[in-house]
Every structure is written in structure tokens, then in C-alpha cells.
Amino acid sequence: MMKSIQLCILLWCLRAVCCHSCELTNITISVEKEECRFCISINTTWCEGYCYTRDLVYKDPARPNTQKVCTFKELVYETIRLPGCARHSDSLYTYPVATECHCGKCDSDSTDCTVRGLGPSYCSFGEMKE
């Protein structure tokens, strides 16, 4: 009886690891432009999931400890025209779309690597247009 419970727990853990690996997922983000003074929601794809990582107890200064995160491997950019902007303003908005994901080091030059970023639904204007 105890062995079958342990086996079930082991299989459940293996399922959690393999089924929630780093992969593409659909998300909704808020986009805004200063000239338009409002936000709209758009759908795109981004990377989500778990990556195997470890934090060493004894730190070795000669070997940097890099945590792996689920991040994009390939990106394309799409452009939309924001509706309802002022007549002479630039209403084009370009946003990233992930096309391939992997577990790797977070690139702070192109990604918000903070623990608590603003989040994809943040709108600085406080007004969302449908």
C-alpha cells in the first residue's frame, strides 16, 4: 500500500515537471502611447513554465551562480495601429511576440528580470479602451 502511494506521488511530481516545462503561452498585455493617453489590451504569445535550477549552499567566487528562467529564444515583432489617437500623432505600436522558448539566463537588456515587475496589464493612464 505504501509503495503504491509513493509511486503515485513520484508520478505526479514527474508529470508536474514534464508537463509544465518552459513553453509558449497566450497572454494579454496592455499597450499605451503618450500621444494617445489611454491603454488597449492585445493578445500575444510569451514564455511560461518551470526550469530546473539550483542555488548552491557554498558559493564559489570563481564560478558564477546563474539561475535559469523560462525566457524567449526567438522573437518577432508585430505592429498595430492604436485606434482613437490624436489625428497627427504616431499611432503605431510595435510589440514582441515570442516564437520559441528555452530555459536560460534572463537578458536584462531586453527583459524585465525583476521579481516583481509592473506586470503585463499595467496601464499608467488608468483608462482602458475596449
Curated annotation (Swiss-Prot):
Ordered alphabetically, the record's keywords are: Disulfide bond, Glycoprotein, Hormone, Secreted, Signal
In this protein, the residues bearing a glycan are 26, 43
| Main localization of the protein described in the UniProt heading | secreted
CC per GO annotation:
cytoplasm; extracellular space; follicle-stimulating hormone complex
- Cross-referenced InterPro entries, in alphabetical order? Cystine-knot_cytokine (IPR029034), Glyco_hormone_CN (IPR006208), Gonadotropin_bsu (IPR001545), Gonadotropin_bsu_CS (IPR018245)
What compartments host this protein? Secreted
Q: Which domain of life is it from?
A: Eukaryota
Question: Per its database record, what is this protein's job?
Answer: Together with the alpha chain CGA constitutes follitropin, the follicle-stimulating hormone, and provides its biological specificity to the hormone heterodimer. Binds FSHR, a G protein-coupled receptor, on target cells to activate downstream signaling pathways. Follitropin is involved in follicle development and spermatogenesis in reproductive organs.
Query: What interactions and quaternary structure are annotated?
Result: Heterodimer. The active follitropin is a heterodimer composed of an alpha chain/CGA shared with other hormones and a unique beta chain/FSHB shown here.
* Protein name as catalogued: Follitropin subunit beta
Q: Which organism is this protein's natural source? A: Rattus norvegicus (Rat)
